[in-house]
């Protein structure tokens, strides 16, 4: 296996938009510039929201752009399954490891209750859990189970987690104050993102995770999980988010910025070149292939702040 293994990890709840694409391009360039490989994992934990047709469309879009991967997705490979919806048994084993350490507890709080409590929020917008159910007795748990199935949270210590991000530089978060006890499993049995990505990145041999800056606050929680599960953590690089010209964050609801619509207006090389320009990898928005950008790639060139797309670039 190459020294560096990066990954694409799209959630197929809709078509790719420019923000997804930018992260995929940077992940691909970072790995390839180090002579590394790319794994494609489909993050369809919530299978009802992520029909397979969207996963197939994501693969086709990535191929069209020239962002070819080495294993995963429908291509398969030695470290499958590559669809999270097929990995419940794998996640269960890791979940039981955490249970055996006495760190998992049931939580009966609803989302509405948490928001009504005016608890502080993490930088990614989630409520920092105030620990309401952390100290429930066995009798209290049994009584609450009669009315509602619980979700399950991981208990975290009052501890600083420090790491150096490949794009953003040194970063520190306190697990208790900045993150709080976090979900491992929903009440309907679906495993949570934080656990699934740690287990998957480890078993797929991923050594470098490139993703959007909106997930920077997940890193401390994930590093803690790597430690508890005895797994080697990858390096992380969080790239700045793309914003619409009016400053709004791009989402899958922005149809004009979906790759499905952009393909009708631009060639693959034009899209790649304009993104490379937006992220500081070339001085003008000239058409480029991903391969041609490999010698130009450096995290030192990538801005640290979110990027507002210039009017008329797309």
Label for each model-derived stretch:
Residues 112-251, 258-262, 311-314:
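Active-site cores that bind ATP or allylic diphosphates and position pyrophosphate for catalysis
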Residues 1-15, 33, 38, 65, ...:
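Non-catalytic terminal extensions that flank enzyme cores
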Residues 46-56, 244-246, 295-303:
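Short, mixed-charge aromatic SLiMs
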């Amino acid at each position: 296996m190459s020294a560096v293994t990066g990954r694409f990890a799209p959630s197929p709840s809709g078509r790719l938009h420019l923000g997804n694409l930018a992260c995929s391009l940077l992940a691909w360039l970072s790995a390839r510039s180090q002579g590394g490989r790319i794994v494609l994992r489909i993050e369809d934990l919530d299978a009802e929201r992520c029909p397979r047709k969207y996963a197939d469309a994501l693969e086709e879009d990535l191929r069209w752009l020239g962002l070819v991967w080495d294993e995963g997705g429908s291509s398969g490979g030695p470290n499958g399954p590559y669809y999270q919806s097929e990995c419940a048994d794998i996640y269960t084993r890791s979940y039981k490891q955490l249970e055996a350490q006495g760190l998992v507890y049931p939580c009966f709080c609803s989302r509405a209750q948490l928001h009504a409590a005016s608890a502080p929020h993490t930088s990614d917008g989630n409520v920092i859990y105030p620990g309401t159910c952390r100290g429930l007795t066995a009798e209290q748990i049994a009584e609450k189970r009669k009315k509602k199935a619980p979700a399950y949270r991981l208990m975290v210590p009052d501890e600083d987690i420090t790491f150096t991000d490949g794009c953003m530089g040194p970063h520190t978060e306190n697990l208790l104050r900045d993150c709080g006890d976090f979900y491992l499993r929903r009440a309907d049995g679906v495993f949570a993102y934080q656990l699934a990505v740690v287990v998957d990145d480890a078993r797929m041999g991923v050594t470098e995770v490139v993703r959007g800056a909106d997930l920077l606050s997940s890193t401390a929680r994930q590093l803690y999980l790597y430690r508890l599960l005895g797994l080697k953590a990858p390096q992380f690089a969080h790239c700045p988010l793309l914003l619409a010209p009016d400053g709004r964050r791009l989402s899958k609801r922005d149809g004009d910025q979906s790759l499905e619509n952009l393909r009708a207006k631009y060639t693959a090389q034009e899209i790649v070149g304009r993104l490379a320009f937006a992220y500081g990898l070339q001085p003008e928005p000239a058409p480029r292939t991903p391969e041609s950008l490999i010698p130009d790639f450096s995290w030192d060139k990538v801005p640290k702040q979110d990027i507002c797309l210039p009017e008329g670039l797309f």
